């Protein structure tokens, strides 16, 4: 329901804004800043995830679980490289009891995904290998975003 979705998004704003900040520094909570759809906010990372889920569900391509490496562009490679850093950020956050590392990482992934998404009309591309690459990256982004959100105590949404 809409009420439930609003509650989840409100929780996202509060939780993410609290966890994005290093505990060793002071910060002032600013509702307007932390509820903005752009920037390091919970709404921004939720929006990136919803965008990815929507794209993935609209696709009619039968996804092959392999990359066509000659068809990866710079934005694809940046996101793939960042996705491969998951264990580093997770261990750093866990070992130091500093959840802001995971929150920062979630923002980094969301930002890179949005950059890839905006650079190419993925579903309109006539090259099925490029489309497959981008959808495969999208599927990994979705999986990692959900895992990161749940690790931070944030419930992912399907629609906004």
Segment roles from a protein language model:
Residues 1, 5-160:
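Non-catalytic interaction-recognition regions
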């Amino acid at each position: 329901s809409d009420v439930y979705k609003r509650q989840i998004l409100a929780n996202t704003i509060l939780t993410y804004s609290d966890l994005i900040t290093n505990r060793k520094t002071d910060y002032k909570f600013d509702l307007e800043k932390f509820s903005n759809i752009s920037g390091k906010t919970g709404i921004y990372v939720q929006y990136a995830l919803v965008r990815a889920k929507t794209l993935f569900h609209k696709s009619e391509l039968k996804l092959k679980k392999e990359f066509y490496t000659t068809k990866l562009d710079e934005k694809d490679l940046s996101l793939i490289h960042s996705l491969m850093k998951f264990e580093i950020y997770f261990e750093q956050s866990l070992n130091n009891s500093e959840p802001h590392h995971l929150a920062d990482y979630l923002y980094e992934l969301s930002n890179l995904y949005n950059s890839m998404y905006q650079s190419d009309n993925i579903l309109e591309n006539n090259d099925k290998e490029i489309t497959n690459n981008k959808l495969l990256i999208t599927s990994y982004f979705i999986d990692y975003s959900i895992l990161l959100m749940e690790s931070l105590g944030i419930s992912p949404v399907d629609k906004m």
